[in-house]
Structures are given as structure tokens and as C-alpha cells.
Amino acid sequence: MQKIEKFLNQYPEKAFFLLLLLALPVFFINLGLLPLFADEPTRANVALEMIISKNYAVPTIGGEYYYNKPPLYNWLLAGLYLLTGNYSEFVTRLPAIVPMFLFAITIFYTVSYFIRDKRIAVLSGLLFLVNGRMLVYDSMLGHIDIFYSWLTFGSFMLIFYFFEKKQWFWLFFTSYFITALTFLCKGLPSVVFQGFTLIALLAYTGNLKKLFSWKHILSGIFCLMIIGAYFLNYYQYNPNLEGYLVTIWAQSSKRTATEFGILATALYMIKFPFEHAGHLFPASLLLLFCFHKSFIPGIKNDRFLKYIAIIFFANIWVYWLSPQTRPRYLLMLYPLLFLIWSHAYYTYRDKLPKTDKAFEWIILGLSILVTMAVPAALFFNLSLYVSLLELKVILIFAMCCVCTWLIYRFKTQKLLGFIGLLLTVRLAFSLFVLPHRAYHKIENYYKAAAIEMGYISKGKPFFFYQYHPGELEIPFHDRLIFYIERTRMEQVKFTEDKVKPGYYFTFDRDLQDPGARLIRTYQDLKFYEVK
């Protein structure tokens, strides 16, 4: 036991990468088990249609222009599809999961460089993987946000790196280059992050005049040239740039206070910090160590921590004032909190002995409760869809026991033992919860229906008839489109007409045509053939 703790104390970098290596199977097991859901099918559709149409400049869904997001992430996903020759859920999620690990590594190295305390770097990087939000939700979805946030966080770090060296050209050039890339991922939020970060840093340090320097202006022009080159190429295929830009603006502004009113916004602002502390649990337990009288002076006296605090508050208010902000929009800001919390933990835990003791009892108590709960998996009929259930339960129980014992016995590394337990919880989630969801989810029924329709209609036109979904229904319909197109490797089309020969899919109506033959009914969805 002492040898393990001695290793963790002497070689924090090796400990970090060892835990990262152990985390690989934890997050990758059963990654492709669930059908696509939420925003995943939208990203997958755009990438797939680029491949089918051989047009990578113009995002489309169902052959119609898709304006909500620029295409950089879709290019990455399409590249993976082509590289692997595979259009599975597993491959669809790789552009999110691989950057998640790269993000953790980036946090580790940047914190190691700027703070020179690898304990803080290890904890900050690992907390990105094991906070509640990432542990059981974002880490299993092929969303754009982890990749986007990784690039944005990298820009934050490069800005400070070049600021410290007073290399103004490289500060502006590299951050604007990343802004161009992130704009081509997600649109206007990238401009907001770049603008607020630069203005806050330069205003606080008395360097606002640098905004008018040739170095800043040239870098900004370079950014606009990259973005402009994309839109110029896009214009060759679709001259409706106004519709594209208006939609990108609407996507960025639709969740703001102007849409929801003063009362709803006020209530949201009150619950915002508590809600996100919940999303980040158990990492947010480290807030306990921020209640030391030296906490704020400690931030002010450290140039890097002060910068982190400045850019956090410079950017967070936009989301604090925007009802219905989704936690994944803040993934580039969460590591700033993990960094500050980790610094507080290692700096003030010896000065707050009662708090430290309470914290240790909390994580030990949570570990014991989790360990005792593991055998309950044997009583939920999981054997219907989990092979070797008893063996897997024994494995998870043993791993939880080992981690709990380490937490109990360690003197200085209890938190790393707890992180080991959290990774074990995620492994249990992958082994038990994901198969349970896959077995019971209605999405499997519709996935099978879409694949069946794809096989039946192969080689012939396929139309979605009078397709006018509400916003909340779009992910459901996009999922159907993806599985149909993946099976056919041809685009579906949207139509208001019912006289063309081919196959028709209707959502809320019959196909009133003498030549229409009803082939299948999938609950309230109908599949017709018109000859």
C-alpha cells in the first residue's frame, strides 16, 4: 500500500497516464451500442450526405441545405467514415471521444507548465473525465462540443502563453487561427469567446491599445480570410448566403434572455450555479477548499490563476443570462474551475484540517455506498442482455472494494483512489446500463424500421412526404434519415408531391393516391410505394 502511494507521490505524470490508459476501455466498451440520439444523427446525416453527393462544401440533410452549423466537424466525421469504411455508431462517436482524452492531456500539460505542480495538473486533467456530466452523458455521445471546446481551451492557453512572453503577433495569430477553425465548427460563439477573452485580458492589463495594432488587425484579417474562403466556395453551389448567415445568427441567439423574458431569466440565474455544481459533482466537492481566507488573495497573486479567473468571468456571463443553456456548451470553461478547485485542494487542505477530514469521510462514505450497491445488479434481470453477468458483477465489486480500501489506507492520495472508483463506476455503466438502455429503448425499433425501409427501397427514389417536423422532433426524424441513407447509400428527398414513382414515408397522414400501395406501418409511421 505504501509503495503504491509512494509511486503516486513521486511520479504524478506516470500516475496520470496510467489512469488515462485504464480509462480507455472504461469509455470505449459498448460505445457503439446505443442507436444515435439527440444531435448525433444530424451530424452523421450531414457527413454521410457529403460522401454520397461528393460535395463537401455544402451541408445538406435530405438533399436540402442545412444552415445551422458550418461543416468542419462534419468533414472530420466524413473523413473517419471514409478512412474506416464504416458508418457505425461507434465511428460516429469517435470524433468526440478521442478529443475528450486529448483534452485531458492538454489540461495536464498546460497546468504542469504554468503552475509547475504536477499534482494539480493530474487532478485537473482527470476531473475533466470523471465529473458527473462527462462520466455518464457527454462521453457516450458523438456531439460537436467536446472537439469544439478542446480547440477553444487550447486558444485560451496559447493566449496566456504568448502574453507572458509578450509575443503579441503570435498571441493574436494563433488565437485567431483557432477562432477560424472553431467558427467553421459552430459559428458565432467562437467570435464571442475570442472577443471577450481578448478584451478582458487586455483591459485588465492595460493593453487595450493592442487591439489597434497591425498585429491584431492582420491576424483578424487572416481569420476572416479563412472563413471567407469557405463561404466563397460555398457560394459557388448555393448563392443564398444570407439565409446561411441569418440561421447561424439565430442558432447563437435563440436561447438568450430576450427570448424568455425577465422572470424566467431571473429564476434561471439563481439556479444556474447550483445546477452546474450538480452537473460537475463529485468534482464540485472541492469547492469546500475554496472557503479559506487566502483563496481569493492566492488567485490574485498567481498570474496564471488570475488569468483563468478573468477569462472565466469574461465568458460565463453570456451563458448565465441565457435560459436553456445546455451544460455541454460550457465544456471549455469547466476545466478552468477544475484547475482552480484543484489548486485550492492542494494549497489549503492542510490549513483546513476539519474540512479535509470531512471531505475524506464524504468520499469514503460515497465509495462504501457505491460498493455495497454493486451486487444489486444481479436482481434486475440484466442477464437477458448482459453476458457473463455474475462474472462482471464480481469484477466490478472487487474493483470497487480495492478502490475503497485504497481511499481508506492512503494518507495523501485518497482523491486519486476516489477517481479510480469513479472510473470503475463508469465501467459498470458501460457494462450494465448501456446494454439495459439498448434493450429497452424504442429507438431500436425505429432504427430497425429505417434499415428495413432502406433495404426494400434500394435503387429507387425515396421521399419523405410533406415533411414539416417541429424543432423537438428533428432528432427523431434525422435518425430515421441517417439509417435509411446509410442502408441505401443514396439520399432521401423531401417532397410535397405524390405523383412521382418511388417510395414514400409519411408521419401524420395517409398517401391519397390511387397508385399508392401501403407496404408497412411502423406504429404511426407509414411506408408506401407508388408505381
Residue ranges and their predicted role:
Residues 13-17, 107-130:
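Transmembrane-helix signature of polytopic, membrane-embedded enzymes
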Residues 173, 293-485, 493, 508-512, ...:
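Membrane-embedded architecture of ER/inner-membrane glycosylation machinery
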Residues 113-115, 155-171, 345-348:
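Membrane-interface transmembrane helices that cradle and orient dolichyl/undecaprenyl
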Residues 24-28, 42-68, 72-75, 254, ...:
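Extracytosolic helix-loop segments that constitute the early lumenal/periplasmic catalytic or substrate-binding loops
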Residues 94-115, 154:
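Transmembrane-helix motifs of polytopic, lipid-linked glycan transferases
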Residues 190-302, 311-327, 336-339, 356-364, ...:
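Transmembrane-lumen/periplasm boundary regions of multi-pass, lipid-linked membrane glycan transferases
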Residues 139-147:
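Short acidic/glycine- and proline-prone juxtamembrane loop motifs at membrane-interface regions
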Residues 170-186, 315-320:
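Membrane-interface alpha helices of multi-pass inner-membrane proteins
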